[in-house]
Amino acid sequence: WAANNLAMLLANQRPDDASSLERALILAQRFADSEQAPFLDTLGWVYYRNGDYQRATEVLERMQATGEMTPERQFHLGMTYLQGGRPGEARPLLVSAVAADQPFAGIDEARAALGSIE
């Protein structure tokens, strides 16, 4: 779990720092064969932060298939869809994430993204 938590922390706290994102990717790639939602979420979000939206989508859709969606995970998949040119699929995920009224890393980004879609 330590590698997962550090990778997510780096992706969330230093999204503009290339060396931090590279380290996050190295840490998260060990989860490529995982079937556990938290690990897939981290890997997908790290791909997203690195600008690899196709891989992010593939991994986060695997995460969604586990059925273990949380507001933060909905946000991650929604943002990935938005960056991938799929606003129609992004919107309900982002609406659900924000409407859950549970704080999560990125809630302000989710609200801003919704404003850009509507």
Which stretches of residues belong to each language-model region?
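TPR/TPR-like (Sel1-like) alpha-helical repeat modules
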Residues: 82-105
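Canonical tetratricopeptide repeat
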Residues: 5, 42, 76, 110-113
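Start-of-helix register in tetratricopeptide repeats
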Residues: 1, 38, 72, 106-109
